Swiss-Prot record:
GO terms for biological process: translation. Residues 61-70 have a biased composition (Basic and acidic residues). This is Small ribosomal subunit protein uS14. HAMAP family: Ribosomal_uS14_1 (MF_00537).
Length: 101
C-alpha cells in the first residue's frame, strides 16, 4: 500500500495537468509551427517554461486504482499485477482465465 500523501499528490497532479492541458497544447503547436517566426517560437518556449512543473503529463504516475501501488501496473485494467492475479483467481475479472497448455 502506497503512502496516502503520494496518492494525494498524484491526484493533485492529474488536476493540474487537466487544468493546463489546453494552454500547453496551444504553446506546443506554436513551438513546432514551421511557418512561425523565431520570436514566436521563443515566446512559446518561454510560455511553456512559465507553466507549473506539474502541468506536464509526464509527471503523473500510473498507480493501482485500489491501493496506489506504483509499479507493475497493467494499464488496460488500471490495477497492479499482484491485484490482477488475485482478482483473476477469485473470478472477479470477467473473461480472464488462467492459461493452461
Amino acid at each position: 500500500m502506497a503512502k496516502k500523501s503520494k496518492i494525494a499528490r498524484n491526484e493533485q497532479r492529474k488536476v493540474i495537468v487537466e487544468r493546463y492541458a489546453a494552454k500547453r497544447l496551444e504553446l506546443k503547436k506554436a513551438l513546432v509551427d514551421p511557418n512561425g517566426t523565431d520570436e514566436s517560437r521563443e515566446a512559446a518556449r518561454a510560455g511553456i517554461q512559465r507553466l507549473p512543473r506539474d502541468a506536464s503529463p509526464i509527471r503523473v504516475r500510473n498507480r493501482d486504482g485500489i491501493d496506489g501501488r506504483p509499479r507493475g501496473n497493467l494499464s488496460k485494467f488500471g490495477i497492479s499485477r499482484v491485484r490482477f492475479r488475485d482478482m483473476a483467481h477469485r473470478g472477479e475479472l470477467p473473461g480472464i482465465t488462467k492459461s493452461s497448455w
